[in-house]
From Swiss-Prot:
The keyword Hydrolase applies. Binds 2 manganese ions per subunit. This is Serine/threonine-protein phosphatase PP-Y. GO terms for molecular function: metal ion binding; protein serine/threonine phosphatase activity. Pfam families: Metallophos (PF00149). Its cofactor is Mn(2+). Its EC number is 3.1.3.16. Signal peptide: none annotated. The active site is at H121.
Length: 314
């Protein structure tokens, strides 16, 4: 299969970023080549990415393509800004295809400035149920869906920013004793039912009970603020960033501001009326938040003034 030329990648990006609520007209053969090229890029990057700031960190997108474009308009289109996405690109929303194609195109175009982690919805068993499979089957073929899910099986699952900020989609794992265990996860792989990879993509916060708890999702665990504190101390980290749960203001702190949940799909599923958030990490690891308000209600984008230093004095 022929490698995409720079011109072809640019044309994909131009078409997608020019859409105004309509569906893209990318041909299946071109999308297939984009998928294969994305896989070749991500397979040479580790399961635990080690990134430098500045970077914008985004949570769940879930096929809300118009809101993804709003994020880029607010925070800067690549390569003017660096990005780390925490997973859950597909399902729920109406334009998973446009969403994942634009993210893949930017990954191919800017492989060292644009990073994609895996979420629990980047799995065949999940996105076959929650919308992605049906969308791809309706607009193209089941074969193309298989190509996407095969590529998802290569995505990294965690990242370190500036050696001090740990990022993943879901949460922590009782099996995680050394961060290099993450790099030892063999690819390609689907998401297992238990273990480190499962927990990194599925675990949730525990606001009521202590320690590790039962997860109502029926998979993985919940974890409390003491587990967060001990994890950060053990690995000389200052902050944990995760996604996976809707939060009203687009971001929400936990564990005495040692953990923050970032969720980037405003008015999730057209009914939650939540804001979307993006965490902006400066070169000196000062974190601030860009808030994407539900466009149906506010028709605007606002920048939050709440800044959080992650240096030793705080």
């Amino acid at each position: 299969m022929a490698v995409l030329t720079t011109h072809e990648i640019d044309c994909i990006i131009k078409e997608l970023t020019s859409l105004n609520g309509s569906e893209c007209t990318l041909k299946e053969e071109l999308i297939e080549r984009l998928i294969q090229q994305t896989r070749e890029v991500i397979k040479w990057q580790p399961m635990l990415l080690e990134l430098q700031a500045p970077v914008n960190i985004c949570g769940d997108i879930h096929g809300q393509f118009t809101d993804l474009l709003r994020i880029f308009k607010a925070c800067g289109f690549p390569p003017k800004a660096n990005y780390l996405f925490l997973g859950d690109y597909v399902d729920r929303g109406k334009q998973s295809l446009e969403t994942i194609c634009l993210l893949f195109a930017y990954k191919v175009k800017y492989p060292l400035n644009f990073f994609l982690l895996r979420g629990n919805h980047e799995s065949a068993s999940i996105n076959k149920i929650y919308g992605f499979y049906d969308e791809i089957k309706r607009r193209h073929t089941v074969r193309l869906w298989h190509s996407f899910t095969d590529c998802f099986n290569w995505l990294p699952v965690a990242a370190l920013v500036g050696e001090r900020i740990f990022c993943c989609h879901g949460g922590l794992s009782p099996s995680l004793r050394n961060l290099q265990q993450i790099n030892h996860i063999q690819r390609p792989t689907d998401i297992p039912d238990e273990g480190i990879m499962c927990d990194l993509l599925w675990a949730d916060l525990n606001h009521t009970t202590k320690g590790w708890g039962h997860n109502d999702r029926g998979v993985s665990f919940t974890f409390d603020k003491v587990i967060v504190r001990d994890f950060l101390k053990a690995f000389d980290l200052q902050l944990m960033v995760r996604a996976h749960e809707v939060v009203e203001d687009g971001y929400e702190f936990f564990a005495n501001r040692q953990l923050v949940t970032v969720f980037s799909a405003p008015n999730y599923c057209g009914m939650m009326n939540n804001a979307g958030g993006v965490m902006s990490v400066s070169t000196d690891l000062i974190c601030s938040f860009v808030i994407i308000l539900p466009c149906h209600k506010y028709k605007m984008i606002a920048t939050d003034a709440n800044q959080m230093p992650t240096n030793e004095e705080e």
